[in-house]
Curated annotation (Swiss-Prot):
Listed HAMAP family: ISPT (MF_01139)
Catalytic EC class: transferase
Record's protein name: Isoprenyl transferase
Entry's cofactor comment: Binds 2 magnesium ions per subunit.
Gene: uppS
Length: 247
């Protein structure tokens, strides 16, 4: 019945009006586990299945860019045991999934301050990016140790260095200058941002890039997020008239 409903929903989609870039704030892993009387870390493990499904669904539907908010600059405040588990889970996910992603022509990129992550994570990240860099299909950005404010600060610092080195004049700095110094330089801004778990805020996610993004919030907890929920978000997106500040 679920697959039948998915097919009915897909038929409603206008394939000519799909977003190029979808961003997802993957929220609710801990609550998913707690509702089942399990430690929070089990929710993170269950969330990997949702990551796998949403990547497959975006490929099938023809989405070109997908950005997943996996670990924020603020998440270091969580208990050490939980942070350590998340880092181990990242290594496990990449070691198991990257060959399949590569086979499916997916480009894997990581955005955020990767230098602060454990060395074992950095090694797997480097392997994944190198293996998939020449692919031409869906681009998956995984935001790790990422914060929108931090990204803007780092972009500003790099621009200031260019001004000091006389590579750039202050008068020539434009919005596009800042855009080209962000982690997502050369990619389109997200057309649609999805947040699971019922929370209704951006939580420091793609702050510069989301200026004109459509926002879709769902009560569904991340481990329960399926293809049909993604299609519901896309159908909502297609009801919106995007004016970008115009009439």
């Amino acid at each position: 019945m679920i697959f039948f409903n998915e097919e009915k929903l897909i038929k409603k989609l206008d394939k000519t009006r799909l977003p190029q870039h979808v961003g997802i704030i993957m929220d609710g892993n801990g609550r998913w586990a707690q509702k089942r009387g399990m430690p929070r870390v089990y929710g993170h493990k269950a969330g990997v299945n949702a990551v796998r499904e949403v990547i497959r669904s975006c490929r099938e539907l023809g989405i070109k860019y997908l950005t997943l908010y996996a670990f924020s600059t603020e998440n270091w405040k969580r208990p050490k045991e939980e942070v350590d588990f998340l880092m181990d889970l990242l290594v496990e996910y990449l070691s198991k999934e990257v060959d399949e992603l590569n086979k499916n022509n997916v480009v894997v990129k990581f955005i955020g301050d990767i230098s602060r992550l454990p060395e074992k994570c950095q090694i797997e990240i480097e392997k994944a990016q190198k293996l998939t860099e020449k692919n031409t299909g869906l681009v998956v950005n995984i935001a790790l140790n990422y914060g929108g404010r931090d990204e803007i600060v780092k972009a500003t610092q790099n621009i200031c260095k260019k001004v000091l080195n006389r590579e750039l004049s202050p008068e020539d700095i434009t919005e596009d200058t800042i855009t080209q110094h962000l982690y997502t330089a050369s990619q389109p801004d997200p057309d649609l941002i999805i947040r699971t778990s019922g929370e209704k805020r951006l939580s420091n996610f793609l702050l510069w890039q989301s200026a004109y993004s459509e926002l879709w919030f769902t009560e569904v907890l991340w481990p329960d997020f399926k293809k049909r929920h993604l299609i519901e978000a896309l159908l909502y997106y297609q009801t919106r008239k995007r004016r970008f500040g115009g009439v």
